């Protein structure tokens, strides 16, 4: 793992077989919930996550915008979203009642309190995958500009050496 002022890059080494990369927007270091995800391409996602309620200040809430890229196309990908608990007739027919629902064929935007994206890979022994993340407190476009400006044309090792 390495970073620049407004970006991060992680390198993961996997065994042979099925491997996965997850971006969990339902968990965080603060108590605030709410996120939005959009699949831009097979290897790029963008969105926003609300952060806040930090240091006992419930009004200190702010968005963090991001662009995430992976360096290899996954064999499959999708979203997950925690479903609200239901009662009565609704609960009887919904197998995902109060649980996490996987969206394996849905490729449009998704929003919610407990969402994420998964990418599945068939990897070889010691295969390395890299994940780049640009962030901004201003906009998704600024997050993309930060990623392009601080990592474009650089390898993981070059960023790590800086």
Q: Can you say where each PLM-predicted feature lies in the sequence?
A:
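Beta-sandwich/jelly-roll carbohydrate-recognition scaffolds of carbohydrate-active enzymes
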Residues: 1-162
């Amino acid at each position: 793992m390495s970073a620049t002022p407004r970006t991060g890059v992680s390198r993961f080494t996997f065994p042979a077989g099925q491997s996965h990369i997850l971006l969990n927007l339902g968990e965080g270091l603060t108590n605030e919930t709410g996120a939005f995800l959009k699949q831009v391409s097979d290897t790029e996602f963008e969105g926003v996550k609300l952060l806040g309620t930090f240091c006992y200040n419930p009004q200190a809430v702010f968005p963090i915008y991001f662009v995430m890229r992976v360096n290899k196309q996954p064999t499959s990908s999708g979203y997950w979203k925690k479903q609200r608990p239901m009662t009565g007739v609704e609960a009887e027919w919904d197998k995902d009642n109060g649980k996490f629902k996987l969206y394996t064929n849905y490729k449009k935007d998704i929003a919610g309190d407990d969402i994420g994206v998964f990418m599945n890979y068939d990897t070889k022994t010691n295969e390395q995958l890299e994940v780049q993340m640009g962030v901004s407190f201003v906009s998704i476009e600024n997050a993309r500009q930060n990623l392009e400006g601080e990592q474009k044309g650089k390898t993981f090792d070059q960023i790590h050496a800086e």
